[in-house]
A protein has these predicted regions:
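Transmembrane-helix motifs of polytopic, lipid-linked glycan transferases
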Residues: 69-91
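Extracytoplasmic loop-helix module adjacent to an early transmembrane segment
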Residues: 1-37
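Short acidic/glycine- and proline-prone juxtamembrane loop motifs at membrane-interface regions
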Residues: 115-120
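Juxtamembrane segments of multi-pass membrane glycosylation machinery
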Residues: 30-72
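Membrane-interface alpha helices of multi-pass inner-membrane proteins
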Residues: 110-111, 145-165
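Perimembrane helix-loop-helix junctions
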Residues: 130-138, 166-180
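Membrane-interface transmembrane helices that cradle and orient dolichyl/undecaprenyl
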Residues: 89-94, 129-145
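Short helix- or helix-capping micro-motifs
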Residues: 99-104
Length: 180
């Protein structure tokens, strides 16, 4: 993306400033990074800038190639969709075809989970949050690892679209108490 390329260029030209752009608190106006920050259209929007940061992390490995970065976004999104599929498959294996269709093959899920969007990241995080919640709450295995994955996924969703987390948490709570 445009913004992630600027962060990537900063990492190449001036690594400390690039790291500030990547990991620093962008809401504190640091004059040392102004040279790069003013070029990033969404620098002032923390939710959009989070996506730029993720894309910039991927850009490190893809040398800022848009196509390769988009493939990494799609792979991350698919991993979350697959985790969601596995979760529901464990619950109802007899309905595996319907579960696969609903988690993996619905066109809108396929579309929104395949580009460099906020939705791509939140879809993946939602899948991983569901998977880790089920594994910790019902299977009671790998609780530390899955707890960390769940907290990380919740943090990602909270950083990008708080309302998704606020509407999903009550569903998890109801699921937890009804399944017991």
């Amino acid at each position: 993306t445009h913004g992630s390329r600027i962060v990537w260029e900063a990492l190449i030209d001036e690594p400390l400033k690039g790291l500030k752009l990547l990991f620093g608190d962008h809401e504190k106006h640091d004059p040392s990074i102004y040279k790069y920050a003013w070029k990033i259209w969404f620098f002032g929007d923390s939710q959009s800038y989070f996506v730029i940061r993720v894309a910039a992390l991927f850009d490190i490995f893809t040398f800022s190639s848009y196509s390769a970065t988009a493939i990494l976004f799609a792979a991350f999104s698919f991993s979350g969709s697959w985790a969601l599929f596995l979760t529901f498959y464990k619950i109802a294996p007899d309905f595996h075809k319907w579960i696969a269709f609903s988690c993996l093959f619905i066109p809108s899920v396929f579309f929104w989970g395949s580009g460099i969007f906020k939705d791509t990241i939140t879809l993946a995080a939602l899948g991983w949050l569901t998977y880790s919640f089920y594994t910790v709450s019902f299977e009671r295995r790998n609780m530390v690892t899955n707890g960390i994955i769940g907290l990380f996924a919740a943090w990602i969703i909270f950083s990008i679209k708080k309302y998704i987390l606020l509407s999903f948490l009550p569903a998890l709570i109801v699921w937890f108490f009804l399944a017991r």
